[in-house]
Amino acid sequence: MNIHEYQAKALLGEFGVPISKGVPVLKAADAEAAAKALPGPVYVVKSQIHAGGRGKGKFKEASAGDKGGVRIAKSAAEVSEFAKQMLGATLVTIQTGPAGKQVNRLYIEDGSDIDKEFYLSLLVDRETSRVSFVVSTEGGVNIEDVAHNTPEKIVTFSVDPATGIMGHHGRTVANALKLSGDLAKQAEKLTAQLYAAFVAKDMSMLEINPLVVTKQGQLRVLDAKVSFDDNALFRHPEVLALRDETEEDAKEIEASKYDLNYVTLDGNIGCMVNGAGLAMATMDIIKLYGMAPANFLDVGGSASKEKVAAAFKIITADPNVKGILVNIFGGIMKCDVIAEGVTAAVREVGLSVPLVVRLEGTNVELGKKIILESGLNVVPADNLDDAAQKIVKAVKGG
């Protein structure tokens, strides 16, 4: 689960992390008062969407002006003017895709006099089963570009969960950022604070880009992006309360109600598969034959007829879907359950696109019989390669 920047900063502030003063705004009419509540005289008006690249992004609407999603204002009146332009407008960034995202919230933040910019993040390293730090002197830019062009400017290290954060970890961060004296002490303190927040709130990723040194000699978190482990949300109701469903795909929200692993993609072939590995292989072979998947959907190994039917409805609700491929290898998952779920869903919502079904494994003959006797227009497939070729051909009208 992701949260907005202003929510992330408020959470980090509870752990003593140095952040600038700011006020979230939902209505343009409140923007000027929000600015006047801050020290000023310079303010930053930040679009709050779940996507990066806001500063370099562009709004679709001409009425929003030609500036990006993060704007510098020199007065409270200018803050108000920016708010009127930005709220309700559609911001397109490198991470939103061409459709963009509507800006429904702004964060009015006190301006900072910046001397240096750094990059600092924490994430769960699945290879070491530890929390890892990624640190770089190159802040305010895409860390992927830094990793590609100047990897020597990135320092990484992990923290042993048995010992937790220790003094030498903070010194490693300070050294990586080439900080000394009081700034080094601030970096050591910040390292401990961030680790404490990360572990206490079951985060999966915490990215600060940039972490800045102000001209007054203070470290400050200028931007923060936080993701949480969905499997741990049950013990963090205060975090779950921060969820903004308007920032999420409606189909993904619906899928989560049935414990389905669903991710919207930008292709035209809907996929229903059991098992993440088989799902990825299915998407790969669709690409191999010249088309792209419309989604990743893993129904899991213990899906019921109702769960399968719900999954099928979610796929058909996507207007971009021009064909559907069901690819099931029944181990724990039984092929007859898949067949019953698919046929029930088709009877309820109808079927206006080609459907190719490949079943193999437990109760496969019974599953094929259910589909055959349903009278539905389903194209059977013998194996994955055959299934991929058939759905691509059907969608292309071959």
From Swiss-Prot:
<feature type="binding site">
    <location>
        <position position="209"/>
    </location>
    <ligand>
        <name>Mg(2+)</name>
    </ligand>
</feature>
<dbReference type="GO" id="GO:0000287">
    <property type="term" value="F:magnesium ion binding"/>
</dbReference>
<comment type="pathway">
    <text>Carbohydrate metabolism; tricarboxylic acid cycle; succinate from succinyl-CoA (ligase route): step 1/1.</text>
</comment>
<dbReference type="GO" id="GO:0005524">
    <property type="term" value="F:ATP binding"/>
</dbReference>
<feature type="binding site">
    <location>
        <position position="117"/>
    </location>
    <ligand>
        <name>ATP</name>
    </ligand>
</feature>
<feature type="domain" description="ATP-grasp">
    <location>
        <begin position="9"/>
        <end position="254"/>
    </location>
</feature>
<keyword id="KW-0436">Ligase</keyword>
<protein>
    <recommendedName>
        <fullName>Succinate--CoA ligase [ADP-forming] subunit beta</fullName>
        <ecNumber>6.2.1.5</ecNumber>
    </recommendedName>
</protein>
<comment type="subunit">
    <text>Heterotetramer of two alpha and two beta subunits.</text>
</comment>
<dbReference type="InterPro" id="IPR005811">
    <property type="entry name" value="SUCC_ACL_C"/>
</dbReference>
<dbReference type="InterPro" id="IPR005809">
    <property type="entry name" value="Succ_CoA_ligase-like_bsu"/>
</dbReference>
<dbReference type="GO" id="GO:0042709">
    <property type="term" value="C:succinate-CoA ligase complex"/>
</dbReference>
<feature type="binding site">
    <location>
        <position position="274"/>
    </location>
    <ligand>
        <name>substrate</name>
    </ligand>
</feature>
<dbReference type="GO" id="GO:0006104">
    <property type="term" value="P:succinyl-CoA metabolic process"/>
</dbReference>
<dbReference type="Pfam" id="PF00549">
    <property type="entry name" value="Ligase_CoA"/>
</dbReference>
<keyword id="KW-0067">ATP-binding</keyword>
<dbReference type="GO" id="GO:0005829">
    <property type="term" value="C:cytosol"/>
</dbReference>
<dbReference type="InterPro" id="IPR011761">
    <property type="entry name" value="ATP-grasp"/>
</dbReference>
<comment type="similarity">
    <text>Belongs to the succinate/malate CoA ligase beta subunit family.</text>
</comment>
<keyword id="KW-0460">Magnesium</keyword>
<dbReference type="GO" id="GO:0006099">
    <property type="term" value="P:tricarboxylic acid cycle"/>
</dbReference>
<keyword id="KW-0547">Nucleotide-binding</keyword>
<feature type="binding site">
    <location>
        <position position="223"/>
    </location>
    <ligand>
        <name>Mg(2+)</name>
    </ligand>
</feature>
<dbReference type="InterPro" id="IPR013650">
    <property type="entry name" value="ATP-grasp_succ-CoA_synth-type"/>
</dbReference>
<feature type="binding site">
    <location>
        <begin position="53"/>
        <end position="55"/>
    </location>
    <ligand>
        <name>ATP</name>
    </ligand>
</feature>
<keyword id="KW-0479">Metal-binding</keyword>
<dbReference type="GO" id="GO:0004775">
    <property type="term" value="F:succinate-CoA ligase (ADP-forming) activity"/>
</dbReference>
<feature type="binding site">
    <location>
        <begin position="331"/>
        <end position="333"/>
    </location>
    <ligand>
        <name>substrate</name>
    </ligand>
</feature>
<feature type="binding site">
    <location>
        <position position="46"/>
    </location>
    <ligand>
        <name>ATP</name>
    </ligand>
</feature>
<keyword id="KW-0816">Tricarboxylic acid cycle</keyword>
<dbReference type="InterPro" id="IPR013815">
    <property type="entry name" value="ATP_grasp_subdomain_1"/>
</dbReference>
<feature type="binding site">
    <location>
        <position position="109"/>
    </location>
    <ligand>
        <name>ATP</name>
    </ligand>
</feature>
<dbReference type="InterPro" id="IPR016102">
    <property type="entry name" value="Succinyl-CoA_synth-like"/>
</dbReference>
<comment type="function">
    <text>Succinyl-CoA synthetase functions in the citric acid cycle (TCA), coupling the hydrolysis of succinyl-CoA to the synthesis of either ATP or GTP and thus represents the only step of substrate-level phosphorylation in the TCA. The beta subunit provides nucleotide specificity of the enzyme and binds the substrate succinate, while the binding sites for coenzyme A and phosphate are found in the alpha subunit.</text>
</comment>
<dbReference type="Pfam" id="PF08442">
    <property type="entry name" value="ATP-grasp_2"/>
</dbReference>
<dbReference type="GO" id="GO:0004776">
    <property type="term" value="F:succinate-CoA ligase (GDP-forming) activity"/>
</dbReference>
<feature type="binding site">
    <location>
        <position position="112"/>
    </location>
    <ligand>
        <name>ATP</name>
    </ligand>
</feature>
